[in-house]
Amino acid sequence: MEGAELIIQEINREAEQKIQYILSEAQKEAEKIREEARKRAQARAEWILRKAQTQAEIEKQRIIANAKLEIRKKRLEVQEALIQEVITALRERLAELPEEEYFPMLVDLTGKAVEELGSGSVVVKSNERTLKLLEGRLDEFKKALTEKLGRDVEVTLGEPITTIGGILVETPDRTVRVDNTFESRIERFEGELRAAIAKALFG
């Protein structure tokens, strides 16, 4: 009986060792699985964080870009409003020029138009105020033109037109004209005018 008990004890001891070994290996494997899962979870978390940071940066840049665009748009709107105010004020100023400033300007504008037409006889048109001014000083006007051009020019006053001022000059047959009314000149030189106003206002 004693021998049998020893055998049983040995079997139990070996079984216990095997059980402990299996449990130890199982624990190691479980820990390994847990570690791998933790690493995967950490990597996943880091990936999610990086993605969120990237998306946040993209959104930040988008917001900044939109804000800059909106600021630029508002600035341009303000600049345009100010430029329009200046142009409107200029139109009003030109429409109310005193005679001593306006008359030599008419001589200059008519002279430029006559040079462009290359004609010895022209018809000049403008608003009623301007035609009345020229009618009252027609001889002086013709003399000033002759001095400016270095040759005689036959000038006929035409019918009134709608304009704030300046002059429209035509050949007698009305086939060719040069529009030197203030509106037309402002329109022709609007780009240069806007640039000059913008530089004066905004530097």
Curated annotation (Swiss-Prot):
<dbReference type="Pfam" id="PF01991">
    <property type="entry name" value="vATP-synt_E"/>
</dbReference>
<keyword id="KW-1003">Cell membrane</keyword>
<dbReference type="GO" id="GO:0046961">
    <property type="term" value="F:proton-transporting ATPase activity, rotational mechanism"/>
</dbReference>
<comment type="function">
    <text>Component of the A-type ATP synthase that produces ATP from ADP in the presence of a proton gradient across the membrane.</text>
</comment>
<keyword id="KW-0813">Transport</keyword>
<keyword id="KW-0375">Hydrogen ion transport</keyword>
<comment type="subunit">
    <text>Has multiple subunits with at least A(3), B(3), C, D, E, F, H, I and proteolipid K(x).</text>
</comment>
<dbReference type="GO" id="GO:0005524">
    <property type="term" value="F:ATP binding"/>
</dbReference>
<keyword id="KW-0472">Membrane</keyword>
<comment type="similarity">
    <text>Belongs to the V-ATPase E subunit family.</text>
</comment>
<dbReference type="InterPro" id="IPR038495">
    <property type="entry name" value="ATPase_E_C"/>
</dbReference>
<dbReference type="GO" id="GO:0033178">
    <property type="term" value="C:proton-transporting two-sector ATPase complex, catalytic domain"/>
</dbReference>
<dbReference type="GO" id="GO:0005886">
    <property type="term" value="C:plasma membrane"/>
</dbReference>
<protein>
    <recommendedName>
        <fullName>A-type ATP synthase subunit E</fullName>
    </recommendedName>
</protein>
<keyword id="KW-0066">ATP synthesis</keyword>
<dbReference type="GO" id="GO:0042777">
    <property type="term" value="P:proton motive force-driven plasma membrane ATP synthesis"/>
</dbReference>
<dbReference type="InterPro" id="IPR002842">
    <property type="entry name" value="ATPase_V1_Esu"/>
</dbReference>
<dbReference type="GO" id="GO:0046933">
    <property type="term" value="F:proton-transporting ATP synthase activity, rotational mechanism"/>
</dbReference>
<keyword id="KW-0406">Ion transport</keyword>
